[in-house]
């Protein structure tokens, strides 16, 4: 009964983590453009 719960949590965390990394990279890129780097 625990394995489906763990797999569901992992499957839910993967897209959240990926989107978080994409947002962080995008904000860093925008900040770099504003500074003229």
Curated annotation (Swiss-Prot):
Its main location: plastid. GO terms for biological process: cytochrome complex assembly; photosynthesis. Pfam families: PetG. GO terms for cellular component: chloroplast thylakoid membrane; cytochrome b6f complex. It is found in: Plastid, Chloroplast thylakoid membrane. Keywords: Chloroplast, Electron transport, Membrane, Photosynthesis, Plastid, Thylakoid, Transmembrane, Transmembrane helix, Transport. The 4 large subunits of the cytochrome b6-f complex are cytochrome b6, subunit IV (17 kDa polypeptide, PetD), cytochrome f and the Rieske protein, while the 4 small subunits are PetG, PetL, PetM and PetN. The complex functions as a dimer. Belongs to the PetG family. This is Cytochrome b6-f complex subunit 5. It comes from Porphyra purpurea.
């Amino acid at each position: 009964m625990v394995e489906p719960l763990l797999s569901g949590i992992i499957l839910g965390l993967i897209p959240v983590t990926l989107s978080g990394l994409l947002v962080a990279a995008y904000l860093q890129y925008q900040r770099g453009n504003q500074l003229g780097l």
